[in-house]
A protein has these predicted regions:
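Non-heme Fe(II)-dependent double-stranded beta-helix
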Residues: 1-67
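Short, surface-exposed loop/helix-turn segments at secondary-structure junctions
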Residues: 51-63, 107-118, 148, 167-173
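Short edge-strand/loop segments of extracellular domains
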Residues: 40-42, 95-101, 149, 155-161
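Non-heme Fe(II)/2-oxoglutarate
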Residues: 109, 129, 136-178
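Residues that flank catalytic or metal-binding motifs in active/ligand-binding sites
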Residues: 5, 33-34, 46, 74, ...
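Double-stranded beta-helix
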Residues: 71-141, 161
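Histidine-centered catalytic micro-motifs
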Residues: 48-55, 95, 137-140, 154
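A structural signal for short, well-ordered beta-strand segments
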Residues: 35-37, 78-80, 152-156
Length: 178
């Protein structure tokens, strides 16, 4: 999208409320990694399989370390919510504490077939931002609300890391961000 339609997306890219958190967990000089993801779901939209955490296919760029009283993360997501998510609506869900695990998540849990009591749906209001590490096992529950789910995902990493290999071709609307 060209100007002025892209301006709100630019404004929240390094929103002053999230920058201190990203500086703390990623370090000064963090950078955007991946192109943004704009998610919309209508009522009865299907969910998305859980991913992240340890186990087969583990990516060392998706790490979580706590050492000497400080948290350090690799690839980190800021999920801006543009619509309310109430209990039972579906949407973003996580397995709390899984970012600290050293063992693979059971396949039945990743498919939401078993152990559902360990899954937490994230509730929030429009305008909220949810920050989490890609090391956390997360996914999407089917959308049950009458209103549309709207969420924007920005992914960041430490300035010296690159999760996406090589360079992506960015949309022209991002040209003025450099």
């Amino acid at each position: 999208w060209g100007n002025p339609y892209c301006d709100p997306f630019h404004d929240i890219l390094v929103h002053p409320r999230i920058v201190p958190y990203l500086n703390t967990i990623l370090g000064q000089g963090f950078r955007m990694d991946h192109t943004p993801g704009l998610i919309t779901m209508e009522e009865d939209g299907e969910g998305h399989t859980f991913h992240g955490s340890a186990g087969p296919g583990f990516d060392p760029n998706c790490y979580y370390i706590y050492k000497n009283g400080e948290i350090h993360c690799g690839l980190t997501v800021v999920a801006w919510q543009f619509s309310d998510t109430n209990p039972g609506d579906g949407g973003l869900c996580v397995i709390p504490g899984s970012h600290k695990g050293n063992f693979a998540c059971p396949a039945a849990m990743k498919k939401y077939e078993q152990y559902q009591e360990f899954v937490k749906q994230i509730t929030c209001k429009a305008g909220d931002a949810v920050i989490f590490t890609e090391a956390l096992t997360h996914g999407t529950l089917p959308w049950k609300a009458k209103h549309q789910r709207r969420s924007l995902l920005y992914r960041y990493t430490a300035g010296n890391l690159a999760y996406v290999s090589g360079y992506e071709t960015w949309a022209t609307s991002f040209a003025d961000l450099t």
